[in-house]
Regions:
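Bacterial Sec-dependent N-terminal signal peptides
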Residues: 1-24
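Periplasmic c-type cytochrome electron-transfer domains
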Residues: 18-216
């Protein structure tokens, strides 16, 4: 009995001795790295003054409402590879709200795609298009959610004259001709969208704007 009690006492001592002290130093280090948590709180959608924007193109409620319509407007998809694809695609073809503003399938298809389903899951290659003719990017489209807070856009951060691209001016427009737009000192998102219109076979001009009812 005395031996059993001794073993129990020894085990109890070992257990309590192994109790870890709180990692206060690690917590402090994490807090320093994170900084002020308030900087991670996004502003309300109508608090336009708190959303990053280009001074040359400030946000207004009218521009926001226009953008919401243009995002899903297929009327400007007139640079299609084949007549069958004319005006059958928009930004919303590949950036699906219900899918986090990304494709709801393995890859998004703009021009050269057909169908949609409920949330983009049924879009597929149009039979009349060769695989090499469809507008599908080499990498999955990024989400366009909250991209106003992104200083450099695209997977490799190639668009935008600020942020990580400061000091890389000599490379703009060299390996990727589209990045020459960075020399215009536009916001990353604006520069990418201007080039994106060409890449995604969209065209905006006065005639189409009026024809689609966006200007009286």
């Amino acid at each position: 009995m005395r031996k059993s009690f001794g073993v129990f006492l020894l085990l109890a001592t070992v257990v309590f001795a192994c109790t870890h002290e709180p990692f206060f130093s690690l917590d402090n280090e994490m807090q320093e790295l994170i900084g002020d948590l308030n900087r991670y709180v996004l502003p309300e959608s109508d608090d336009l003054a708190s959303i990053p924007q280009s001074p040359a193109n400030p946000l207004t409620p009218e521009k926001v409402n226009l953008g919401k319509m243009l995002f899903f407007e297929p009327g400007f998809g007139v640079e299609a590879m084949h007549p069958e694809g004319m005006q059958t695609f928009s930004c919303g073809s590949c950036h699906i709200p219900a899918a986090g503003f990304r494709p709801n399938r393995m890859q998004g298809i703009a021009d050269g795609g057909v169908g949609f389903g409920l949330n983009g899951e049924a879009r597929d290659k149009y039979p009349g298009y060769a695989a090499s003719e469809i507008d599908a990017q080499g990498a999955r489209p990024l989400s366009v959610l909250n991209v106003a807070f992104v200083s450099n856009t695209m997977w490799n951060g190639s668009f935008g004259s600020g942020g990580v691209n400061i000091g890389t001016e000599h490379r703009w427009g060299v390996a990727d001709p589209g990045t020459a737009i960075n020399h215009e000192q536009l916001g990353a998102l604006e520069g990418q969208n201007i080039e994106g219109l060409k890449v995604h076979r969209l065209l905006y001009n006065r005639e189409l704007v009026e024809a689609n009812g966006y200007k009286a």
